[in-house]
Amino acid sequence: MKKTTTRLADGRELIYYDSRDDTARTATDRRPLDPVSTASEIRHDRLLGDAVAIASHRQGRTYHPPADQCPLCPTREGRLTEIPEADYDVAVFENRFPSLAGDSGRCEVVCFTPDHDASFADLTPAQAALVLDAWTDRTAALSQLPQVAQVFCFENRGAEIGVTLGHPHGQIYAYPFTTPRTERMLTSLAAHREATGGRNLFDDVLADERAAGRRIVLEGDHWTAFVPYAAHWPYEVHLYPRRRVPDLTALDDAARTEFPQIYLELLRRFDRIFDEGDGRGPRTPDAARTPYIAAWHQAPVRAADRAEFALHLELFTIRRTPGKLKFLAGSESGMNVFINDVPPEAAAERLREVASK
């Protein structure tokens, strides 16, 4: 992997990740951009004890542009974009409309491919491995910033999820605090350790799922994907490395080598689970793509027991059947009590049925 760091016209950082060591990245950003002005603020909820980012400047962010005006495509034929080069492998840059900025953290955009019409599932194993390298490198770099407490790499896909740019891309949030979801995991981790005389909760969850077998979706030598026993979403899969590590930087070479094959197969199964159509005519390519969120859970940077935390990826869709979405209604949004219409065992069986031939 070759890494090239440069700056956009407004001073934001842009990083190219290339598979070839002899790739030269010399193009400059020729757009007449004003300096980025953000108003990001972290406010703490006194009742719930969590944090909310207030970011009013995001009201003006780019919203569903036509494909020929996509800001994440390479700069070609005189059309200037966020990426000055005419081509790229993987590109990462500071978000122009960040939810977190300055002392409140940092937000970055990760462009997986220059192909506007592709998706992560369309990548080759080598391309997926390069994205993993980029996630890992950014996790290491962002973890060194004094204001950053946790690094979150994720992908939102699909208009149903709320994606405003159709180009295949993900994001990285570097939070100035440990997120509420992770805090709850750490609390459960400590309680389990106390109750079992030192056993690790993540290790036990993975061992129990592998022993039961009913919710396993696929396994490799170094990774296991399963639908959790108490899945919140209709189709939700957790992907764990067999060897517990706290974050992406700690994965060994064997796990890194196997990851692309496992993850690409998992994403392709997600695209097949609703492939029978919705009864309203021929399916379009976009309709065949299941909307999802893919979220890497990593240990907080300076947590006292970070070595006990287990890196894992959670992949889920809000689609429950063809043409029908799982909306967060009163119980979920008002009280954070999820109601799942699809039994986890049935979801796992469906995801096994659509395995690649």
Where are these regions (language model features)?
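Active-site microenvironments that recognize anionic phosphate/pyrophosphate groups
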Residues: 1-167, 173-246, 251-254, 267-268, ...
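Acidic, glycine-rich loop-and-strand cores that form catalytic or ligand-binding grooves
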Residues: 261, 265
